[in-house]
């Protein structure tokens, strides 16, 4: 959803609901009351010692919808689609997207694609604030959930950082234990009454899509964004201990290239000289590989949550992605949109509707 060019990334992430004449065919009432969210409270970093952190004074009966999945699996698209059907607000749970800056590199959904739906904790933390930890997300995220519920809206927690999701929702959370990497037992007791939607697809299809998406991101300004990031503070590329936004995929890969071939501030991806382009293409290859490896790790953590007792409802988006990639440049986008609605959006809407009626 990051670019306006007609490529595979835009093709998949922009479903027909962006057309004002399109209406969902689902038998779910449209509720579009959108109160403005309150100003975000000032973030105060929390200690991350080994002590157990109890839950905030939340009500266990409060309902929260959680949309999970690997990077690039369509979580943001599903959240926007569902938010046009239910009175809701979206809480970002991607650990890189909480920071301001590098909007293309971190795949933030741009404001114009949010359709007026309130989004929280996206671009909210200044990168100079340092590391925004799972403990910080637990405290701030639960506060945002309380605010959303107080307005009579449904919180949607959306993102691929499963460590953030676990910290937010587990009844008792130990910041000193990396439960999702195998050390410790997954807590199946939750702070809220949760409905988990897991957007999944076959990994070969996701791998192909992610590699194409990286190309589209560079065609949409990712390189120029990284050059500007470099010139804003060249020292950040020299620091050994990375924190916060410096860990975003794309920054470390280009750091090595920029040390050897410092970019000119006027450089553009399309106008690079052959020497620099050859050097930078190696960084692009690394970005593609690291993105696919991240997706594998995210899927592994989701499966660990499932095996630990979390009731995850899996939505298979494989055929929708296949159709989207096949439709690139063919003008046949309606087919994959129909598949998405039949196999992902429709079942998800029914699950959420039943969840709210329970």
Write out the residue ranges for each language-model feature:
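Residue-level signal for inorganic ion chemistry
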Residues: 94, 122, 160, 221, ...
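Phosphate/Mg2+-binding loops and adjacent switch elements
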Residues: 147-224, 228
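Charged, alpha-helix-enriched surfaces in structured cytosolic catalytic cores
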Residues: 132, 136-139, 159, 163, ...
